[in-house]
UniProtKB/Swiss-Prot annotation:
Motif ('HIGH' region): 11-21
Positions that bind ATP: 264
GO MF terms held by the record: ATP binding; glutamate-tRNA ligase activity; zinc ion binding
InterPro entries, sorted: Glu-Q_tRNA(Asp)_Synthase, Glu/Gln-tRNA-synth, Glu/Gln-tRNA-synth_Ib_cat-dom, GluQ/Sye, Rossmann-like_a/b/a_fold
Binding residues annotated for L-glutamate, in chain numbering: 8-12, 44, 205, 223
Species of origin: Albidiferax ferrireducens (strain ATCC BAA-621 / DSM 15236 / T118)
Name of the protein in its database record: Glutamyl-Q tRNA(Asp) synthetase
Top-level enzyme category: ligase
Sites where the protein binds Zn(2+): 100, 102, 126, 130
Motif annotated as 'KMSKS' region, chain positions: 261-265
EC number in record: 6.1.1.-
């Protein structure tokens, strides 16, 4: 039996939605409706130190003002940490996760000694210092071994998405994005063993999103292009955990006046929902859809008909 389409929008309550996040929300909602599927909302508050109290309610109100209503009650990652611990425990038992004692300075020093002192999108490529043990130091975090997956055949996908082309060959992960086309990444070389649980006890986005997508039966992930770089890590985690890989569609970014990506970190203005149709029309144009007049409901219906991603 073919799985029903299930999509999701997963905002972090570190600030209100802005114009860029509405693009991802609208695209994921339209994709679900165009496929006669379900659209879920998940509040990604696993990074608790960065979350702002009450911001989850603000985000849900912004979505509602724009006519974007979930088909099930929202879920909060902060209430699901037991699931993430179970997944981490499974990886530890399999020898795929290990404790790490390294600070950022330790990693920079190790990379410098190797002549590889380089950062990728601000991230340091972890050199595997603690793979062989802590050597008397105290573990600060848990990392995933990225160099052990050798399968060279099509990967398991959700039944709905069997046409997706996914492959892991010689540690290089290949996948097809519905908008960006063929993609690949050598995770061990370009990312290194990445963190699953931080020194402060918080689980990372990579582990939480993989566990939640599987638990909620997500068939299609529609999100901003700034998150495309995470896809290979998530596919690797899915396969390590024996979870299906959904299809991925990464939407265009909204850029600021100087060409920078709009984000909460660089002070993007909160989404103004006093005129929701104006906000939605701006998001629709980014997605290549025509502007609509009239009601919000009428515009959403027209865009569902026009959606062909």
């Amino acid at each position: 039996m073919v799985a029903q389409y299930i999509g999701r929008f997963s905002p972090s309550p570190t600030g209100p939605l802005h114009a860029g996040s509405l693009v991802a929300a609208l695209a994921s909602w339209l994709d679900a409706r165009a496929h006669a599927g379900q659209w879920l909302v998940r509040i990604e508050d696993v990074d608790t130190p960065r979350c702002v109290a009450g911001m989850d309610r603000v985000i849900l109100q912004q979505l509602a003002a724009c006519g974007l209503h979930a088909d099930q009650p929202p879920v909060w990652q902060s209430q699901r940490t037991g699931l993430y611990q179970q997944a981490l425990d499974q990886l530890v038992v399999q020898g795929l996760a290990y404790p790490c004692a390294c600070s950022r300075k330790d990693i920079e020093t190790a990379l410098s000694r190797l002549g590889q002192a380089r950062a990728r999108h601000g991230e340091l490529v972890y050199p595997g210092t603690c793979r062989t043990g802590l050597h008397g130091r105290v573990g600060r975090a848990w990392r995933l071994r990225t160099d052990l997956f050798k399968q060279n055949k099509p990967l398991a996908t959700v039944e709905y998405t069997q046409e997706a082309t996914n492959l892991i060959a010689c540690n290089i992960i290949h996948w097809t994005d519905r908008r960006l086309g063929a993609q690949q990444q050598d995770v061990p070389a370009q990312v290194g063993d990445f963190v699953l649980k931080r020194f402060d006890g918080c689980f990372t986005y990579q582990l939480a999103v993989v566990v939640d997508d599987a638990a909620q039966g997500i068939t299609d992930v529609v999100r901003g292009e700034d998150l495309a770089d995470n896809t290979a890590r998530q596919i690797l985690l899915q396969q390590y955990l024996g979870l299906p890989t959904p299809r991925y569609l990464h939407t265009p970014l909204v850029l600021g006046a100087h060409g920078e990506k709009l984000s909460k970190q660089n002070g993007a203005q909160a989404l103004d929902t006093t005129e929701p149709l104006a906000a939605l029309n701006h998001a629709a144009r980014v997605l290549g859809l025509p502007a609509c007049s009239g009601s919000v409901a009428g515009a959403l219906e027209a865009w569902v008909e026009a959606w062909d991603a």
